[in-house]
Amino acid sequence: MVQPLHDTSDPRNAGILINVNGTLTPRGEAMVSVFDSGFMLGDGIWEGMRVHGGRIAFLDRHLDRLFEGAKAIAMDVGLDRAGLEARLYETIDAN
């Protein structure tokens, strides 16, 4: 089997939970619908965030950029800042 170019096995990631629309899902079961606009059209925004000691470094700046990017492409994030922050920390705490 061909290994993807940027796929590096890391046993620390084997049991992680992925937050899919508010549901914590085992990594192997997490999926996005083929009808999702991010999949079909490539619509999307993302922020890479560093977690240290259970806290997200520079969270306010990350959220500023994320919401600005969403506005630029008319994307509804689906949560306000407080809701997204809560969901991020729920996911961190679960892992």
Which sequence ranges carry the predicted segments?
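Conserved alpha/beta cores of soluble small-molecule-handling proteins
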Residues: 1-95
